[in-house]
Amino acid sequence: MKALILYKSIHHKNTEKIAKTIADELNADIYNIDKVSPDIIENYDLIGFGSGIYFGKHHKSIFKFLDKISKTNKKAFIFSTAGFPFLKSMFHKELRDKLKSKGFEILGEFCCKGYHTYGIFKLFGGLNKNHPNEDDIKKAKEFAKSILKN
């Protein structure tokens, strides 16, 4: 299965670390979603979409990208880094729904802690400093292996 990782990682490159980890495990090509054209997905069977969580959802660039693609029958997975990863189901809902509306089969979802310094958290030195850490990376590898089994 030919895999592609599309991600957006801004402030601390938390999501980029996770994207690279998953890409290594899947032997996937990896791109910042802003650097590719939507027709790139035609060359792949499996596409991972990920970003940090901004105001409760994935970065808007992912949604803009998906708005430009036609309906498909490809497989996908979702990943993110967040200040509050236990809210993954809620954070991923909008992207999950968008992918399903485009015909993607969702194989899994992953979220881990990410260093978060936005807004008031900056005043206190941030939330989840030193994340993603080694344990988060290990869990991302395990997640990628589980995707290969699907």
UniProtKB/Swiss-Prot annotation:
Pfam families assigned to the protein according to its UniProt record, in alphabetical order: Flavodoxin_5 (PF12724)
Single GO term (MF): menaquinone-dependent protoporphyrinogen oxidase activity
Superkingdom per UniProt: Archaea
Domain Flavodoxin-like: 4-148
Swiss-Prot/TrEMBL GO biological process terms: heme biosynthetic process
PANTHER family named among the record's database cross-references: PROTOPORPHYRINOGEN IX DEHYDROGENASE [MENAQUINONE], PROTOPORPHYRINOGEN IX DEHYDROGENASE [QUINONE]
Stated name of the protein: Uncharacterized protein MJ0298
Taxonomic classification: Archaea, Methanobacteriati, Methanobacteriota, Methanomada group, Methanococci
